[in-house]
Amino acid sequence: MKTLLLTLVVVTIVCLDLGNSLICYNTMMQKVTCPEGKDKCEKYAVPVMRGKFYFSYQCTSKCHEGAYDVCCSTDLCNKSSTSG
């Protein structure tokens, strides 16, 4: 009985901890768990030459605001098939 109770407590702690972690893509298109305080995923455009952009992907607390930028707050929402 004690083992069952301990198992339930451990499972509850693990589930609660995982529920608070946002997962985003980083610039290398790897999945990363965002640190505390970074509650959004973003894809933002960095101009590299006239009319061409490099897209950066990251966890953030405040998103960039541009015509090609994406800001979202669900797991893996900042993936894009668009290339600059």
Curated annotation (Swiss-Prot):
GO terms for molecular function: toxin activity. Its main location: secreted. It is found in: Secreted. Disulfide bonds join C24-C41, C34-C59, C63-C71, C72-C77. Expressed by the venom gland. The keyword DNA-binding does not apply. Residues 1-21 form the signal peptide. Keywords: Disulfide bond, Glycoprotein, Secreted, Signal, Toxin. The keyword Ligase does not apply. InterPro entries: Snake_toxin-like_sf. Glycans are attached at N78. One of its GO terms (cellular component) is extracellular region. Belongs to the three-finger toxin family. Short-chain subfamily. This is Three-finger toxin 3FTx-1. It comes from Micrurus corallinus.
